Amino acid sequence: MGILKKENEKSAKPKYNMWQCSAYMISLAWREKEKKILLLCLLQVFLAVMSNLVNLYVAPSVLSVVERGASITELLTMVLIFVILIMFCSAATSYVNSNTLYGRVTVRLALISDINKKACTTSYPNLFEEKFTKLSAKCQQATSNNQEATEAIWDTLTSLAQNCIGFVIYLFLLVSVDIWLMLVILLTSLIGYFVNKKLTGYGYRHREEEGGISRKLWYQIRQAQNYTAAKDIRIFGMKPWMEEITDKAMTAYTAFHRRAHNVYIWGSILDLVLTILRNGLAYFVLIDLVLSGNLSVSAFLLYFSAVGGFTAWVTGILGSMTTLYRQSLDISIIREFLEYPEPFRFQDGEKLSDATGTQHEIKLENVFFKYPGADDYTLEDINLTIHPGEKVAVVGLNGAGKTTLVKLICGFFDPTHGKVLLDGKDIREFNRQDYYAMFSAVFQNFSLLAETVAVNVAQSEENYDMERIKDCAEKSGLTAKISSLKDGYQTYLNRTVYEDGAELSGGETQKLMLARALYKKAPFIILDEPTAALDPIAEADMYSKYNEMTKGCASVYISHRLASTRFCDRILLIGNHKIVEEGTHEELLKLSGEYARLFEIQSKYYREEDVCEKGQETAHLA
């Protein structure tokens, strides 16, 4: 089955053909109000054809004047006319070409924006789909520079149009010579085109393989340049190991493109053979006409040039079609990515504001969950209700499923079996963006914007409440640090982007994330190990303010430190993929179960550590 699936993927046709992809790019230019791209392309076509015709007729026309024995004045006039025409075409072409770049870049950037929007707003489970991640990597490659399909397609369409017009003009010019000659030229050209089309489809048929190789390579390159990995690379001597892995990825990448090149080269060889046959036959016919006295010298020169030009037009059409086909493969992939199915409901979901009041209750009913592609369940038979304003703590060993439970509550995943209900209604019925708006969170992995402190707290560049930002910073314990910064709340973060940007420590960043979570004022607040990077004093300060910080909202607090959960209304202990114990801190201790055992182990550790510190202090005083 695996082999059959792989073969089907290789032979799969692109979802959109090259004409649909071309129409898509034109509509995108129209949407972005870059209609001048089309006008400039038409001007390029007109000037290219005009320039070619001028160059075609210049030598035969001058020779014809000489053959007729015309005056020197007529000859010079003829030469001057052609010089002016050539200069005009050259100058106009340069002017038009210099004005085409901006609009094309704008359209490509708009496409990049669409791709980024899809990546940022897609249903969370899609991020774990291999097909989605491969399409995403291909989209990044297809929009990475000016030579990629999303921008180069305009040159291809322009080239195709001018080649088609030139072909028609030259066809009428040469049809009087020999109709069979024209048919032979067309036939050999079509054979070359269809064979080339089949060969150049190799890249698309093997796009899954190429996508996987590219993702590995670019991951290694990004990791080598990753600021956060710099310390690990140096301390653990990872440089040789990373170089070895990168070399393997580059070798695989090079090998793939070498195989593709070996396929493409056969198309080039066939083109060469067919071109020799076409030109040889055409020149034989023309020379025979001259020798039989049916063509003048100037006419021979015209047709001789026209045959070469006609062949160039035909080759140009086929080359442009082949290039357009190859570029359309990338654009088709981009469209597939943008249209990737969404398991969650967004715009078509029920508006949350219309369905619920201000007080909310979340309930998990018989929830089972396993990650995409996994065989075993991470969580089994979870039944949980979070009441309005309730403070719930979730504890358990590493890998117990605490963070997974939070992902289900937040709606990042839907249960494999069972339901997550908001105020008694399945969250799958709601607009998922509206549902996300119900939550504020501090996750284990967080990200800072290369923006000011104020913008990072408010998550908005405009219309933010400065007093509320300061209040949230005070509650999270970040006020002193912000006061020490050069521009206070207007200080930019991230030294990679801003030379004078501030760099926060892990604990300071965690406080900033807490301030951001408080600023949102959501009905539910999720705190996943919010004190992991804090020192004991800052941690104790956060505990003392917890009730104040979470006033008016329900909260879910995840922690490994069992002593830190005393201020919660209810504690859930996750173990063996289930909720094994539930109650207040005191109730769970009285049960003398797993929670009490873990608490005793942690308490013993802290007592021993305290005794050790006191012993060292006594020895120091002695």
Language model segments and positions:
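ABC ATPase nucleotide-binding domain helical subdomain, centered on the C-loop/LSGGQ "ABC signature"
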Residues: 419-421, 436, 454-499, 543-544, ...
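Extended non-transmembrane interhelical loops and adjacent amphipathic helices
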Residues: 1-23, 105-151, 213-256, 328-341, ...
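Cytosolic ends of transmembrane helices, especially the final helix of ABC transmembrane type-1 domains
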Residues: 238, 282, 303-339
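C-terminal portion of ABC ATPase nucleotide-binding domains
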Residues: 3, 488, 544, 552, ...
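Membrane-integrated ABC transporters
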Residues: 1-51, 72-77, 96, 100, ...
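Helix-to-loop junction immediately C-terminal to a conserved catalytic motif
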Residues: 410
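Transmembrane helix-loop-helix hairpins at lipid-water interfaces of multipass membrane proteins
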Residues: 38-92, 172-203, 277-284, 288-298, ...
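ABC-fold ATPase nucleotide-binding domain signature/coupling loops
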Residues: 136, 377, 415, 421, ...
